[in-house]
């Protein structure tokens, strides 16, 4: 009789363990994500995107989206630790979503309830997004954009003309010897202000030119456009002689304050995004993540 009771007890314990295991679809650093949470998140995504009928492939994609959403959420909550998200921030975030969708304030949560969606899953995602926004906000204080980066961005847009100050070195003949000497000269050209006549006088001439980029013709325009100040071009051939261009300065013309601020904001947001992606990628990389739900 004792042996029979032992077998029943072991069998019962095994079934309880199995039931507990099947109710967990993933774990993040030993923090479980339950099947109920997964179904709630999946239902929420479907409700917010007005999805009703799914093909098998779409259902698989939605499963992946829901489980990864919950994993990212868990990582963010663990990153935040004991820091609480104030209720007014949550309320304002919900109002912002309602405003964007032209909904009356207070109607979004009721809409989810009407769709049989647990609002708690939505609130948790709002909280995780607010944690993410706090991370982005803290990163913004460490991001700086240089004038050089602004100039490069404006130049690459091809929407503004540029005034170029450059030194153009031209060989006195087109011999192989002249080509070799011009290559040696190219390696010695570091700054326009440091150029001395003795560097080139025996085999080349130098002309200082100020011109709008749009007025420079042919291949020279492409070469000059790609050069940064105090950077010499490679040696290139023009009319059976060899030339080098050393750009001294570039001045972008007709850029107003609004255009400049737009570029600064664009570059700042780009840097913040890159830093944030690195942080979120490292979160995943360092975390112990197990997915027990079939992908």
UniProtKB/Swiss-Prot annotation:
Signal peptide: 1-19
Gene source species: Rickettsia prowazekii (strain Madrid E)
The keyword Signal appears for this protein: yes
Gene3D superfamilies for this protein: Porin chaperone SurA, peptide-binding domain
Domain of life of the organism encoding this protein: Bacteria
Organismal lineage: Bacteria, Pseudomonadati, Pseudomonadota, Alphaproteobacteria, Rickettsiales
Keywords linked to the UniProt accession: Signal
Pfam families found in the cross-reference section: SurA_N_3
Name of the featured protein: Uncharacterized protein RP673
């Amino acid at each position: 009789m004792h042996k029979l009771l032992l077998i029943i007890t072991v069998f019962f314990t095994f079934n309880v363990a199995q039931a507990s295991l099947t109710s967990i679809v993933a774990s993040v650093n030993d923090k479980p994500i339950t099947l109920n949470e997964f179904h709630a998140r999946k239902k929420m995504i479907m409700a917010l995107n007005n999805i009703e009928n799914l093909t098998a492939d779409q259902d698989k994609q939605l499963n992946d989206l829901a489980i990864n959403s919950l994993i990212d959420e868990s990582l963010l909550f663990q990153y935040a630790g004991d820091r609480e998200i104030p209720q007014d921030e949550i309320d304002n975030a919900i109002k912002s979503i309602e405003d964007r969708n032209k909904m009356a304030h207070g109607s979004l949560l009721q809409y989810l309830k009407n769709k049989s969606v647990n609002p708690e899953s939505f609130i948790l995602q709002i909280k995780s997004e607010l944690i993410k926004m706090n991370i982005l906000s803290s990163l913004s204080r460490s991001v700086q954009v240089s004038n050089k980066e602004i100039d490069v961005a404006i130049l690459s847009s091809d929407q503004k003309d540029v005034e170029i100050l450059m030194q153009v070195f031209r060989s006195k003949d087109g011999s192989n010897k002249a080509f070799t000497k011009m290559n040696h000269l190219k390696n010695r050209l570091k700054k326009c202000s440091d150029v001395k006549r003795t560097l080139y006088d025996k085999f080349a001439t130098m002309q200082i030119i100020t011109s709008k980029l749009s007025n420079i013709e042919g291949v020279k325009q492409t070469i000059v456009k790609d050069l940064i100040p105090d950077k010499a071009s490679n040696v290139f051939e023009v009319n059976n002689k060899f030339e080098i261009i050393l750009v001294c300065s570039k001045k972008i013309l007709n850029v107003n304050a609004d255009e400049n601020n737009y570029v600064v904001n664009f570059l700042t947001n780009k840097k913040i995004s890159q830093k944030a992606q690195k942080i979120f990628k490292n979160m995943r990389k360092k975390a112990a993540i197990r997915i027990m739900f079939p992908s």
